[in-house]
Amino acid sequence: MKYTQLGRTGLKVSRLVLGTMNFGPQTDEADSHAIMDAALDAGINFFDTANVYGWGENKGRTEEIIGNWFAKGGDRRDKVVLATKVYGNMGADGEAWPNHDKLSALNIRRAVDASLKRLQTDHIDLYQFHHIDRDTPFDEIWQAIDVLVQQGKILYAGSSNFPGYKIAQANETAARRGGGIGLVSEQCLYNLFERRAEMEVIPAAQDYGLGVIPWSPLHGGLLGGVLKKQAEGGRRASGRAADTLADPAARARLQAYEDLLDKHGLEPGEVALAWLLTRPGVTGPIVGPRTAGQLESALRAVELEPSGELLDALDEVFPGPGPSPEAFAW
């Protein structure tokens, strides 16, 4: 496994991040533990979760599965850089109470303590704001975070799904307040198919020294060779993926992508991950395997070094959004 520093911090993390959103809803506890064991054995030390994972009436279940894995003992917790998130309402669907969501000081304090209990640990290494909060000022958010850092309950703060201007606002507020270092990471939707983060999120993250952690690196499986798999009788796409495949232009791009990689004898999913590892500012993509076999495929991507010729060809199939935000600067 290869490692890098998380943004401007001294924290060393693996270039693949183990995503755990499937733990509970799609992968049972025993298989989830097996995946975490395999990831740790392979050198992945960066695990990502969220308080709402488990979803519906089972919100928090994913953190519980991870906590039970830590409780097995050994040096599991000491080896893992643990990241979780706060924002979503933790009440059962249809039973949401005020002050049990978003980023108020009250909810942050409550959410941290609840996550620590489920995770069976005394601290969270990276505590991420799962979404922007349009109602709570950053002065209040940072006041709550500063207390938690002083208490040793969290070490670093990060963002998720933030626009560039909110990254700037958050860190300028932290700098004005003094003391804390502000956001150190941004977790965003970013992959070959969806490159809008290059317009202003990633430039802002780089300017403020945030490590970029892409989620959905295969764009819901579309970059994993979906057309070939469907032709061979594989699982049919659903939801947004099905909507994308119904678009003739999108389908043509995916076909060109699969044809290109077939010509090079490469696996689409591995190339999609390897491409992200070449991108400026990227710490590592989140991979969310449902099985140990899917994890093995992701691990191969770390050793794959796409040629300049291949990277240029990928840009032709999936062009970036352009020179924004400095399109007219000189």
Residue ranges and their predicted role:
Residues 1-80, 150:
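N-terminal binding-site loop/beta-alpha segment at the start of enzyme catalytic domains
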Residues 7-23, 83-99, 123, 128:
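N-terminal small/glycine-rich loop or linker at the start of catalytic domains
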Residues 14-15, 76-80, 122-126, 155-156, ...:
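Short acidic capping loops at alpha-helix termini that bridge into adjacent secondary structure
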Residues 20-30, 94-109, 130-136:
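Active-site mouth loops of central-metabolism enzymes
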Residues 27-39, 104-119, 167-172:
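Short, acidic/polar
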Residues 38, 42, 118-119, 152, ...:
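Structural motif
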Residues 116-136:
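Active-site groove signature of glycoside hydrolases
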Residues 132, 136-317, 330:
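Beta/alpha (TIM)-barrel catalytic core signal, keyed to glycine-rich beta->alpha loops juxtaposed to Asp/Glu
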